[in-house]
């Protein structure tokens, strides 16, 4: 299978404007093997910033096609140190974009244009349009900054940010917390409420790719906990869910750990040349569950090889 990669390139050095390159889509070939990953997320060479951001020429958005229906986008660390990952999942009639990144400016961070052109390629290959749903793994600024780029656009639904709006849109029950299905058309996702990092936090499981998207609740970095009892319950819920389903990777929204076990990059770092791979595995999720259970009702900072628990 030919790997497909889509990137922006600067029009001229030093300008924020970016041109979109669609040269290597190979849509027909990808459609024939739609469920076969084109890349291994654990081996992708992600843009990791620069020692001198003034001189770096990486695109504002790195786009990697995981398979014929799935894209992973990463924001340039020199544009914003958080460098969040965003995820675009496409079904027969609906596409889901998880998060809108850390920068609002559409000239510097042309997220809507990027997503629209990816979807146009898919629509051209399949002969019909899809509706785009824009949702968030949780309500923090580095995950919703570019919402305004999508607001009011045709064939776009922007999901609300607070826990009640999220629960209503996806049909989630709050007492007790239960997951719900979300149909994209031939691709049914499972949405799990996982409060703790933030009240509106959700996880998304995609049986097509067997990826479990966990936002800022589980990722290779500093796991900031706002509500400790809720976080403990959510981690346990994730483990129970993942045990019942085939999970290839646990995929969060940031990378803050280095490849040196237990060593993270400081907050604000714009150059991470030795960063940890994006995906975690079930073993990492189980270790996190054991750690929070061992802490019981007394939250404390704990350092693991692949993550750091940071109660607030």
Walk through the language-model features, giving the residues of each.
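N-terminal secretory signal peptides that target proteins for export/translocation
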Residues: 1-9
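Bacterial N-terminal signal peptides
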Residues: 14-28
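Accessory terminal helices/loops
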Residues: 28, 32-55, 236-312
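Conserved beta-strand hairpin/beta-sheet module of binuclear metal-dependent hydrolase folds
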Residues: 60-121, 204-217
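Short, hydrophobic/aromatic-rich segments at coil-to-beta transitions
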Residues: 67-73, 179, 186-190
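Hydrophobic/aromatic beta-strand patches that form the interior of the parallel beta-sheet core
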Residues: 71, 133-135, 159, 192, ...
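Metallo-beta-lactamase
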Residues: 95-97, 102-104, 190-195, 199-284
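Active-site HxH/HxHxD metal-binding segment of metal-dependent hydrolases
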Residues: 104-186, 280
């Amino acid at each position: 299978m030919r790997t497909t990669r889509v990137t922006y390139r600067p029009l001229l050095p030093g300008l924020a404007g970016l041109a979109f390159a669609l040269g290597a889509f190979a849509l027909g070939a990808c459609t024939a093997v739609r469920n076969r990953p084109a890349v291994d997320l654990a081996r992708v060479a992600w843009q990791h910033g620069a020692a001198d951001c003034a001189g770096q020429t990486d695109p504002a958005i790195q786009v990697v096609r995981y398979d014929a229906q799935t894209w992973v986008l990463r924001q340039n660390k020199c544009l914003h140190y958080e460098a969040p990952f965003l995820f675009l999942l496409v079904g027969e009639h609906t596409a889901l974009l998880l998060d809108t990144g850390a920068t609002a400016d559409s000239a510097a961070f042309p997220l809507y244009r990027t997503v629209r052109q990816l979807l146009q390629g898919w629509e051209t290959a399949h002969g019909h349009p899809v509706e785009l749903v824009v949702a968030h793994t949780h309500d923090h600024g580095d995950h919703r900054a570019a919402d305004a780029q999508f607001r009011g656009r045709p064939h776009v639904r922007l999901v609300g940010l607070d826990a009640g709006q999220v629960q209503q849109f996806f049909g989630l029950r709050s007492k007790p917390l239960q997951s719900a299905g979300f149909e994209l058309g031939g691709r049914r996702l499972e949405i799990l409420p996982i409060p703790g990092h933030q009240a509106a936090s959700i996880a998304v499981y995609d049986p097509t790719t067997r990826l479990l998207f966990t936002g800022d609740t589980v990722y290779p970095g500093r796991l900031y906990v706002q509500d400790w009892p809720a976080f403990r319950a959510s981690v346990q819920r994730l483990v129970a869910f993942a045990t019942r389903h085939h999970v290839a990777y646990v995929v969060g929204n940031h990378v803050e750990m280095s490849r040196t076990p237990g060593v993270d990059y400081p907050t604000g770092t714009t150059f991470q040349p030795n960063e940890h791979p994006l995906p975690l595995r079930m073993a990492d999720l189980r270790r996190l569950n054991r750690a929070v259970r061992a802490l019981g009702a007394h939250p404390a900072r704990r350092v693991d090889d692949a993550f750091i628990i940071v109660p607030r």
